[in-house]
Regions:
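Hydrophobic beta-strand positions in blades of beta-propellers and related beta-sheet-rich domains
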Residues: 80-82, 144-146, 176, 188-190
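Multi-bladed beta-propeller domains
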Residues: 148-165, 191-203
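Hydrophobic beta-strand positions that form the internal "hydrophobic ladder"
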Residues: 129, 173-177
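A flexible loop/linker signature enriched in serine peptidases of the S9 family
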Residues: 122, 134-143, 159-162, 179-189, ...
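Residue-level detector of Asp-centered blade-edge/turn motifs that repeat once per structural unit
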Residues: 121-125, 171-172
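Amphipathic beta-strand/beta-sheet edge segments enriched in Tyr/Trp
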Residues: 49-113
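Short beta-strand->alpha-helix linker/helix-N-cap micro-motif
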Residues: 1-54, 65
Length: 203
């Protein structure tokens, strides 16, 4: 696996650590990254000039990620840089913007950027999944959910006593379509995610 150190700049460290914990979890979940415990690091560089590449080679560290969060008028901004230890160079400098209460989404987007920079393959942490659950202890036993790729930030779209099958996303991911048997026969519905509004394709 790629051996990566993730470091939060001093200052707004608590909020930065919250987002970086999402980045760390996303990358570990791929099975392709080993994330260092910061307590075991010899130093916590804040800038490129602070990096002593020799000590990082002693730790067998492949890459260093240094990140910082700043509050903006519109929300929060995560700035991060990735350094290649073997080649002693910066390989990425990016900024990701988000809403203050959507720090998880910010972390997912950042982890996708880190993953692609290091592996050359686009990440999937910022994508969403959709699934149907079935329970036997209630009348509304079929439920359609969407969630982040890690299964968190779950959002219920529909409850029904009848089966819900074949859910699919619209091209822009703002709507979903599915087959529901709530009227007694198979019927295709399209539903807006943001508003919950839906309509039947077959009248």
């Amino acid at each position: 696996p790629y051996r990566l150190a993730i470091i939060a700049k001093e200052g707004n460290q608590k909020q930065t650590q919250k987002v970086l914990s999402i980045v760390s979890q996303d990358l570990k979940r791929t099975g392709e990254f080993y994330i260092f415990d910061n307590k075991l690091l010899l130093s916590l560089p804040q800038t490129e000039e602070d990096i002593e590449y020799r000590e990082w080679r002693l730790l067998n560290c492949d890459f260093i990620l240094i990140a910082d969060i700043q509050e903006t008028v519109a929300g929060i901004q995560l700035s991060y840089e990735i350094f290649d230890v073997a080649n002693k160079e910066k390989i990425r400098s990016s900024k990701v913007y988000g809403i203050t209460d959507r720090f998880r989404q910010l972390g997912h987007y950042a982890s996708d950027g880190v993953y692609e920079t290091i592996t050359g393959i686009p990440g999937i942490a910022s994508t969403r999944i959709m699934y149907v659950t079935q329970t036997s202890d209630s009348k509304s036993k079929f439920q359609l959910f969407i969630a982040d790729a890690d299964g968190l930030n779950e959002q219920l779209l529909l409850r029904s006593s009848e089966p819900i099958i074949s859910p699919v996303w619209s091209p822009d991911s703002s709507k979903v379509a599915y087959v529901s048997f709530e009227t007694g026969v198979a019927n295709v519905f399209i539903q807006e995610i943001a508003t919950g509004k839906r309509f039947s394709v077959i009248n």
